[in-house]
Amino acid sequence: MESYQNQSGAQQTHQQLDQFGNPFPATTGAYGTAGGAPAVAEGGGLSGMLHRSGSSSSSSSEDDGLGGRRRKKKGITEKIKEKLPGHHDSNKTSSLGSTTTAYDTGTVHHEKKGMMEKIKEKLPGGHH
């Protein structure tokens, strides 16, 4: 059988493209299709550009309008660290005052012992 593809007598299908280069579906013209071109609404869109607002939350300090600066809001990690016992920043002061009495003068400072030191203490004759 002969193939009529790409020959002068063959019917060629020309694929139509819209304004963005996308192909239209092939239409035969039957059942009331007017011209085969789809209706494209033009105007009022974002035209592919993202628009951002002028506000930003990434700055560490910002102008308060009165010539001063405001401090940055605390993040979640700072809030958690604040609630944990132990190390706190040196610029923070505690509201508890330290009072000493006469019987507090004989305090003994105990060092934390490692596991090997604890085992060595339990061995007989091994107190070095």
Curated annotation (Swiss-Prot):
Any one Pfam family match given in the protein's UniProt record, by short name: Dehydrin
Signal peptide: none
Gene Ontology biological-process entries: response to abscisic acid; response to cold; response to water deprivation
Region (Disordered): 1-128
Gene Ontology MF term list: metal ion binding
Biased composition (Basic and acidic residues): 75-91, 107-128
Ranges of biased composition (kind: Low complexity): 23-41, 48-60
Induction record: Not induced by low temperature, abscisic acid or drought stress.
InterPro entries with a match to the protein in the record: Dehydrin, Dehydrin_CS
Polar residues bias locations: 1-19, 92-104
GO cellular component, one term: cytosol
Family: Belongs to the plant dehydrin family.
Name of protein: Dehydrin Xero 1
Organism: Arabidopsis thaliana
